[in-house]
Amino acid sequence: MPPHLYLSMHWTGRLTAEEQQNILDWIADERAKSSLSSDAIKSLKGEPIQPLPLKVALDERKVALGHKLFFEKLLSGDETMSCASCHDLTKGGTDQAKVATGIRGQQGPINSPSVYNASYNLAQFWDGRAKDLQEQAAGPVANPGEMGEEWDNVVKKLSQVNEYKNSFDALYAGKGLTKTTVTDAIAYFEKSLVTGNSRFDQYLRGNNETLTTNEKAGYELFKLNCASCHFGPTLGGGSYEKMGEKHNYFNLRGGELTEADNGRFNVTKDEKDRHFFKVPSLRNVELTFPYFHDGSTANLADAIKMMAKVQRNKDLTKDEITQIEDFLKSLTGEYKGKLVTKLNDKDVQ
């Protein structure tokens, strides 16, 4: 029986072990019906994580245009920065810095999230203020602390480049080069940034030998402690959750609270959303350090320890942390047929 129906009829009752298992079985059955699980082997279709696709069907001409724009410094006010400055594809789609640095060395208020697999997110930015990739692409360009340029100037500069003008005339017939078509092209390229074929994806598709015993043990621990928030093909991006569900994260972190610490509240102004953030993807997580919205945690083991404490009230052993860390490293995927950990500038530009 679906959990919401059971609880509506037995809202004061306690679930027996058998009833709990029945609900878990129902959840697994529902997951198995998802199209995202279509290429997982039958016995693993009900897992909380689904494999990423090996290929995404896209118009390669628009991908190429968006790719060029992603690395285009004309988008910034002083022409020193591009999207790739904060979302380096050789660094897990981040800048591996505590907070982003904008034009003229300005320090931003928040950690740069990964651009890889971002098309799977329910919204963009840590606070979800952009509904999709196109809306997100428009923001940093006009932000004075990031790329610091006006969109009218961006369009004017790009229009003076014949290659851009001709490409937009061809691919956006009747529209040409505008803010809307530029952000659409960038977003379209970002849809191609899917890092499939990780060792864990291979495991879900039936290669039982691709994971070590330690990694499998880590996955079992992960399912018990982490998968209620980090689920789906990207292990995140599907919900907003409170930072510090069981313990006050900000007290443990120390330091003054910042506006960025408000999280989703900054968008909705609803007190219930204070300190809620979009759950980050854990794909390629070994590369996306430092961790959390504030970039406060330098290494993955400490991030696991902190999350277990503040979200689950668990004090994991050193061995348990190592096992979960080993599992998370099995989530590192490929871009253009090469492991993300091995990409260099030539591979991505």
Language-model features, listed with the residues they occupy:
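Terminal end segments
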Residues: 320-322
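Alpha-helix N-cap/helix-initiation sites
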Residues: 76-77, 179-180, 317-318
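Short, flexible active-site recognition loops that position polar ligands and cofactors
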Residues: 10-17, 310-318
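Short helix/strand-capping connector loops at secondary-structure junctions
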Residues: 2-10, 303-309
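Short glycine/threonine-rich turn/loop motifs
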Residues: 40-139, 202-298, 302-305, 314, ...
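Bulky hydrophobic/aromatic "packing anchor" residues in well-ordered structure
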Residues: 1-2, 115, 133, 168, ...
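Post-cleavage N-terminal segment of exported redox proteins
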Residues: 7-8, 12-64, 121, 139, ...
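Central I-helix of cytochrome P450 enzymes
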Residues: 145
